[in-house]
Structure formats: structure tokens, C-alpha cells
Regions:
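Conserved AMP-binding A3 loop
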Residues: 8-35, 42
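Conserved S/T- and glycine-rich ATP-binding loop of Class I adenylate-forming
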Residues: 13-16, 49, 64, 94, ...
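AMP-binding/adenylate-forming
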Residues: 25-32, 48-103
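Glycine-rich helix-loop-beta junction characteristic of Rossmann-like nucleotide cofactor-binding loops
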Residues: 39-43, 105
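Gly/Ser/Thr-rich phosphate-binding loop
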Residues: 108-157
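Short Gly/Pro-enriched turn/cap motifs at secondary-structure boundaries
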Residues: 160-164
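AMP-binding/adenylate-forming core of the ANL superfamily
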Residues: 170-182
Length: 182
């Protein structure tokens, strides 16, 4: 789909907040999201990344788009609950869901920067991450925002209690009390 002449792609939501559905998104928006992630985490051409989530959902798809757009080296492993098992090389950037993070905690020294999305990270797990050398960020986002729009560092000297909007993203509440993301 990425190399098709169409300006849009179909992505599928996971159904975490209701029934799974298909949505159309512009490739330009996907490129913008990839570049925002690259700028936020200081990714540069040749950095190594890990795809350990299914490509049928936005998180996996966006890891591929980031690699293509930013010139990153992409290592692909079968999605599993312990994706770092069998990885011998150092990974500069990876994305996981909380269960993958929990099952990989003893191998996180293989990853420089890790983002975690798809669900809240348990406070007990966050406590276990405090001496891990990896920079670990919980993300806030959804398929409709093409992954994360806010991050919260979970460990290290810059850890935070609150999510911070990424550069150029801001939030407001509308008349109905609903969150609006710009």
C-alpha cells in the first residue's frame, strides 16, 4: 500500500475502545508522524529499530513508515510476548505494548529508547524500570492520531508524572467536555 499511487492508506483500529474499524489516512499525515517521532527521539539515518508488533495495526505500520522515511535500519521479529529474546544486536529505538515490556525487562539493555503504548503501564512495572538503562516512554495516542501525540518518561533523570504533548500538538476540551487533539 505504501508504494501505491494512492494518497491514502487504510489502517485498522485494534478495537480497544469499541468494535475494530477501518479508517482512511493520508500518507502525508503518516510521513509527518514519522518525522515528529524522529525529531522527538533524535532518530537519525542508519539508527537501528525493531518491529515486534503486528503490521495490521497502526503501531506496526508506523514502525515501517518511520524506517522508510527516516532511513532507519529495521529488524523484524515475529510478534511475541518477549520480542527481545534472540536479539543480539543493539537497538536504538523500539515500540512495544506493556506485556512485551514486562516480559523483556531483563533484556532491555539491548534497547536505547523504547516507547510503550496500547495500554497503561502498571505502576508496579514502572517501579521495576527505575534502574533500567533504557529511556522508556509511555505514549498516549490512537490509530486516528497515527500513534503517539504525547509521551511520559517512565524512568531516568527526566522521568515525569505527566504526559507532555509532542511539539506542535496541543489539547483542548470542547463544549461537550470531549478532548480535542490538534
Amino acid at each position: 500500500d505504501w508504494y501505491s499511487p494512492n494518497d491514502e492508506m487504510t489502517l485498522h483500529t485494534s478495537g480497544s475502545t469499541g468494535s475494530p474499524k477501518s479508517i482512511q489516512v493520508k500518507k502525508e499525515w503518516m510521513r509527518n508522524s514519522a518525522n515528529l517521532t524522529g525529531n522527538t527521539f533524535g532518530l537519525k539515518e542508519g539508527d537501528s529499530t525493531l518491529l515486534c508488533m503486528p503490521m495490521k495495526y497502526v503501531a506496526g505500520t508506523m514502525m515501517v513508515v518511520r524506517a522508510l522515511e527516516l532511513g532507519l535500519d529495521l529488524t523484524i521479529v515475529e510478534p511475541s510476548s518477549n520480542p527481545l529474546e534472540g536479539i543480539s544486536e543493539q537497538i536504538d529505538f523500539a515500540a512495544m505494548v506493556p506485556i512485551q515490556l514486562e516480559n523483556s525487562i531483563d533484556q532491555l539493555d539491548k534497547v536505547k529508547t523504547l516507547i510503550v503504548g496500547g495500554g497503561q503501564v502498571d505502576p508496579k512495572l514502572i517501579k521495576r524500570l527505575q534502574n533500567v538503562p533504557t529511556d522508556i516512554y509511555e505514549t498516549y495516542g490512537m490509530t486516528e492520531t497515527l500513534t503517539h501525540v504525547a509521551i511520559k518518561q517512565l524512568n531516568g533523570s527526566n522521568k515525569s508524572k505527566f504526559f507532555q504533548a509532542l511539539d506542535g500538538v496541543h489539547f483542548e476540551v470542547d463544549d461537550r467536555g470531549c478532548l480535542v487533539i490538534h
